[in-house]
Every structure is written in structure tokens, then in C-alpha cells.
Amino acid sequence: EGLMRTVIKNCPIALENPEDYDARANLMWASSLALNGLTGRGKQGVWSCHPMEHELSAFYDITHGIGLAILTPRWMNYVLSEQTVGKFAQFARNVWGIVEQEEEVAAKKGIQALYDYFVACGIPMTLPEVGIEADKFEEMAQQAVDHSAIAEKAYVPLDAADIAAIYKDCLTESQFI
């Protein structure tokens, strides 16, 4: 959560002033910690968005981070359930500072905050904006299942139909609250 707050604080500063050494250093430090495996210690499973995005990057020439930004809020919304609502409400409260007693409302506000943040950073937020249409969704979804443990070991296991549905959700702009 602290790493996410660091990125949320420093990314707009670095975008506004690319010469801001402190903002860039904080982003690099947060990125290093996020990617070195430390944050996953003691946790099980795979994060579903990575294998889903790997297929977008394999089939189309897009940046991994942009694909993740497009997918993540839609994935969160798709898997939002009694099983996940507590974790997503915690994300909303601890990362975004959302004050909301109702768990589902807090979770949806957190998902919306993430989506709006990506928009504010100037990130394309639909697949058509990065040149991806629906014609290969089923094939990419099956590849995501075949090339990962997403169907068995993910936080919320997903099959190819689930993944194709998430891709479809990424065709248009979204509202979560």
C-alpha cells in the first residue's frame, strides 16, 4: 500500500516536471521494490492481470504498463464479490484514503479512483485506443490460461471465458460507481 501511495504521489510530479530528481527517484525505488519479489513474499497465487496483459503485448505491440492500466480496474470490477470485497475496500481506504463504511461502495470507489488516476496520468484506458479490437479475444484468453496458472492459482481463478469477458469490458470507457 505504501508503494502504491508513493507512485500516486510522485507520478504526477514527474509527468509535470520530468527533471524532478526526487519524484523520479521515488518512482524508481517504488518500482524496484514492487518488481523484486519482496512484496509477494508470504503470499500465494498469481496476479491475473499479468498473464492477461502478456497476451495483449504478444499479439499487439503495446507497453506492458499501459495494458495493465487498461485491464486492472476492469479485472477488479469483474472479480468483485463477497470473497474479494474486503481486500478491495482495504485498497480503497488505505491507498486512496476513501472514507466509506459500506464495503462494496468503498471497493467500487477505490476501483474508480484507480481508473481516474490512470486517466489523469494520460494513459489510454480502452483497448481500441491502443489499436486492439475484439477479433482475437478468445484466442488471447485461451493463451493466457495455457501459459499461466491463472485458472488454478490466481487470487480469483479465471477461465478463458472470464478473461475474454474482461477484455470485452476494456473496449469502452468505464464507470464503477
Predicted regions and their residues:
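Active-site segments that bind and position negatively charged phosphate/pyrophosphate groups
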Residues: 1-113
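C-terminal charged capping/lid subdomain of soluble metabolic enzymes
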Residues: 88, 95-177
